[in-house]
A protein has these predicted regions:
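PAPS-dependent sulfotransferases, especially Golgi type II membrane carbohydrate sulfotransferases
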Residues: 1-18, 24, 28-31, 76-197
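Flexible loop/turn segments at secondary-structure boundaries
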Residues: 15, 46-51, 70-73, 132-135
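Conserved phosphate-donor/acceptor-positioning beta-strand/loop module used by diverse small-molecule
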Residues: 42-43, 53-78
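Flexible, glycine/threonine-enriched loop-and-boundary segments that flank and lead into catalytic domains
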Residues: 23, 29, 33-59, 114
Length: 197
């Protein structure tokens, strides 16, 4: 719902992040084996309030996987369109494209703004092309940046997981950028500053 998203974007999310931190603390309290372990929060939604998330989770490392928006925007729109259509037949691909094109642009701009004002050591950058070339090395770099000891067993476990979860073994994600009312040129123009970095 666009009006809800617009409202949410104006609200202070600090209490929500404090509540989230408390939930994780409760999880660790309930299961002593989790104590002292790192948490991984994976969602691009954190980009809309990254400054707040970093304030509440003061020792968090932000891992940013950089991929060309020409690929990610239509892919994300396709995923969202699939999710939306589960709940409504009135939602069109073009409606999803219009909404998420703007939202992803806002998130990216927000990320770049927060990044420019934050200590460099809070961030770990991973180029998607490098991740595809050598996922174990990239995983090792991320873990080391997060202060996690990378033992030979960890490297072996990563390699085994990657071997068991090959991208080629999954069905391809098929979509056409024009289905969402978008074009490569539109994306290149909207994300020009991000794509230059």
């Amino acid at each position: 719902v666009r009006s809800y998203a617009a409202w949410l974007g104006t609200e202070d999310s600090e209490q929500a992040y404090k509540d989230l931190r408390e939930i994780y603390q409760a999880f660790m309290w309930q299961d002593p084996s989790r104590q002292g372990k790192k948490w991984v929060l994976k969602t691009p939604g954190h980009l809309m309030a990254l400054d707040t998330a970093m304030k509440v989770f003061q020792d968090a490392k932000i891992v940013m996987t950089h991929r060309d928006p020409v690929s990610t925007v239509p892919s994300y729109c396709s995923m969202e369109s699939t999710l939306y259509r589960m709940g409504s037949e009135d939602i069109t691909h073009v409606m999803v494209g219009e909404y998420w094109f703007e939202r992803l642009s806002q998130w990216t701009d927000s990320f770049m703004s927060v990044r420019s004002k934050s200590p460099e050591e809070r961030f770990v950058d991973v180029k998607y092309t490098e991740l595809l070339k050598d996922p174990v090395v990239q995983g090792q770099l991320v873990l080391e940046a997060a202060g996690i000891d990378v033992t030979p067993d960890v490297i072996e476990d990563m390699g085994e997981w990657i071997e068991a979860n090959k991208r080629e073994d999954r069905a391809p994600h098929k979509y056409d950028i024009s289905d969402f009312g978008l074009s490569e040129d539109m994306i290149k123009e909207k994300f020009a500053v991000y794509r230059q970095n």
